[in-house]
A protein has these predicted regions:
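A solvent-exposed, acidic/Ser-Thr-rich amphipathic alpha-helical stretch
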Residues: 4-5, 17, 23-79, 89, ...
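Basic/polar N-terminal segments that are highly enriched at the extreme N-terminus
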Residues: 1-5, 139-142
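Hydrophobic alpha-helical segments of small multi-pass membrane proteins
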Residues: 75, 92, 108-112
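Short beta-strand edge/turn micro-motifs at domain boundaries
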Residues: 85, 105-136
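Generic short beta-strand segments
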Residues: 88-95
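Amphipathic alpha-helical repeat scaffolds
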Residues: 12-16
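A generic "structured core" feature
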Residues: 21-23, 110, 141-142
């Protein structure tokens, strides 16, 4: 796929499969190189390199069942040369971990794609759940 928007559409479809526990479609969109990265709540610190990213994607996808990534809202995009970064809000609903009921949640996500020959490949994803502000949390001024 050489059209960036087409690749992003495939990426969103792959995330829908991810929400059902199948990480393979997302893995297929990644560049399988030593410089790729992934940061998500299941792996703690960001991981670097294809082998570790693939393992982290397997771990993360194994935590989801019976889910959907129902909506993505693009907040911003930055495209230049052979790199493109999108910032999105993703609306998910899934059974997570041992939970027996599917719950909705919102992720804030930054994804970077790189043009590899004539195809765009993912090289970075950082996803965090958005939670309610905690006035007593560690990042609040006193």
């Amino acid at each position: 796929m050489n059209d960036l928007e087409e690749v992003i559409g495939s990426y969103h479809q792959a995330l829908d499969q991810f929400a059902r526990g199948d990480g393979e479609p997302v893995k297929a969109l990644y560049a399988h190189t030593d410089d790729v990265t992934l940061a998500n709540p299941f792996v703690g610190l960001p991981v670097h390199g294809w082998t570790r990213v693939a393992e982290a994607l397997d771990l993360a996808s194994s935590n989801f069942r019976d889910g959907v990534m129902s909506r993505s809202d693009r907040v911003a995009q930055y495209i230049g040369g052979d790199l493109a970064t999108i910032v999105e809000l993703e609306q998910w609903q899934a059974k997570v971990g041992d939970r027996q009921e599917a719950k909705p949640f919102l992720l804030r996500v930054t994804t970077t794609f790189r043009l590899d020959g004539d195809s765009w490949k993912m090289v970075h994803r950082h996803a965090d759940p958005i939670s309610s502000p905690n006035p007593d949390g560690p990042l609040r001024a006193s």
